[in-house]
């Protein structure tokens, strides 16, 4: 197949092809990454990238929006159907943009946010001091207990002391299910709004493999990739008409200008895929595969944060190991397994080194790998970590896993 890009910019084309090979030959196990649908990539690469459309359907500041109005309206309706809610904003460029828009809509400068501590699994936008949310608002955090679980009684005590305007329940590295009902009870107790950030588990939520944030959360944010397998982007949902109006104003003109219509079309395509029965089977596989991996690692005496997992990810704990999360990340990468170093509860090393790694099952499940493959992968991870400086072992395992990966091809071309 001939590509314009190959003729006009061979340098970039060759690098894309190099990444294409890496994605096919490596085992992608970063919990926030996934393989999107080819149809989504076709929409992303369409002529819709040419169209500016500031505003919302039938309320644009530019002409010529008749077609993109239909596209955005379709994306909104599909999102509402998928998440069983009354209002959806599909314009947020990312999950971080979605969260920032929620704060912009519902808070005043220096209002109080209560979110999960970064080292316990929270996200930068949940109030981390280095982020905009930690600078523009007063941020406070809750963590996990010694077992690695959220202690809801402790969250209540902190909320009663802090009296936040908004409580964020959600995570970027927490291996257990969120109890939205308990969080709502805490929010009601202190008069706070509740934001459910389901960026990581949205695909599980819509497939009934994780508790649903509605009717408990006042507003819900998400990404459209990760477990949803859609394009990179953000999404905001609510059942409250007043909140919905504030969200729309906070996105445009509050925090963004023109929406990315090619991305919104791709979101619509992704939502249609999510509504299919096959997607429920996929989400079930994501969870069951992670259970297999956790079991394999525990049988090899590896320590997991919270002792296991209830979703699509797990965290390995190296607090009592001579090697760090960074060491493990590099060693596994050399063996063809892509993970990421991650801070864990009780962290003693710097965020650039860490005492843990985060591992996810969504991407390999999208390739069709099942229990057999995940058991093999668990054993290989164990072998590498138990002899972490053995470079020849890493290279040997890399070839073994490359052969396995080739049995489950991702895509048959690098550009759609």
UniProtKB/Swiss-Prot annotation:
It catalyses: (6R)-5,10-methylene-5,6,7,8-tetrahydrofolate + glycine + H2O = (6S)-5,6,7,8-tetrahydrofolate + L-serine. It is found in: Cytoplasm. Pfam families: SHMT. Pathway: One-carbon metabolism; tetrahydrofolate interconversion; Amino-acid biosynthesis; glycine biosynthesis; glycine from L-serine: step 1/1. Belongs to the SHMT family. Disulfide bonds: none annotated. The modification N6-(pyridoxal phosphate)lysine is found at residue 226. Homodimer. Catalyzes the reversible interconversion of serine and glycine with tetrahydrofolate (THF) serving as the one-carbon carrier. This reaction serves as the major source of one-carbon groups required for the biosynthesis of purines, thymidylate, methionine, and other important biomolecules. Also exhibits THF-independent aldolase activity toward beta-hydroxyamino acids, producing glycine and aldehydes, via a retro-aldol mechanism. This is Serine hydroxymethyltransferase.
């Amino acid at each position: 197949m001939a590509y314009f890009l190959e003729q006009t910019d061979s340098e970039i084309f060759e690098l894309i092809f190099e990444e294409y090979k890496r994605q096919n030959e490596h085992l992608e196990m970063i919990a926030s990454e996934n393989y999107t649908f080819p149809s989504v990539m076709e929409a992303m690469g369409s002529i819709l990238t040419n169209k500016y459309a500031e505003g919302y359907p039938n309320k644009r500041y530019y002409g010529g929006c008749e077609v993109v109005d239909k596209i955005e309206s379709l994306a909104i309706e599909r999102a509402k159907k998928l998440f069983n809610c009354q209002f959806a904003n599909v314009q947020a460029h990312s999950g971080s943009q979605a969260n920032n828009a929620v704060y912009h809509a519902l808070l005043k400068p220096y209002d109080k946010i209560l979110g999960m501590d970064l080292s316990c699994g929270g996200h930068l936008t949940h109030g981390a001091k280095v982020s905009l949310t930690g600078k523009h608002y007063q941020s406070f955090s809750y963590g996990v207990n010694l077992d690695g679980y959220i202690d809801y009684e402790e969250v209540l005590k902190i909320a009663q002391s802090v009296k936040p305007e908004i409580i964020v329940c959600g995570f970027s590295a927490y291996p257990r299910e969120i109890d939205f009902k308990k969080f709502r009870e805490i929010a009601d107790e202190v008069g706070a709004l509740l934001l459910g950030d389901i960026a990581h588990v949205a695909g599980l939520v819509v497939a009934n493999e994780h508790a649903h944030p509605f009717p408990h959360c006042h507003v819900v944010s998400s990404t459209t990739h990760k477990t949803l397998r859609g394009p990179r982007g953000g999404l905001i949902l609510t059942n409250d008409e007043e909140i919905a109006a504030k969200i729309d104003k906070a996105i445009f003109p509050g925090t963004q200008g023109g929406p990315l219509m090619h991305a919104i079309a791709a979101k619509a395509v992704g939502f249609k895929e999510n509504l299919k029965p096959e997607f429920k089977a996929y989400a079930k596989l994501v969870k069951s595969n992670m259970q297999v991996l956790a079991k394999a690692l525990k049988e090899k005496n590896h320590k997991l944060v919270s002792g296991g997992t209830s979703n699509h990810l797990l965290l390995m704990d190296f607090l009592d190991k001579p090697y760090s999360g960074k060491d493990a990340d590099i060693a596994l990468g050399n063996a063809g397994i892509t993970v990421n170093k991650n801070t864990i509860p009780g962290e003693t090393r710097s965020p650039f080194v860490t005492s843990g790694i985060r591992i996810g099952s969504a991407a390999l499940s999208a390739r069709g790998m099942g229990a057999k493959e995940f058991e093999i992968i668990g054993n290989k991870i164990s072998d590498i970590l138990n002899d972490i400086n053995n470079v020849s072992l890493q290279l040997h395992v890399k070839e073994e896993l490359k052969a396995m990966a080739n049995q489950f091809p991702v895509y048959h071309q690098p550009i759609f």
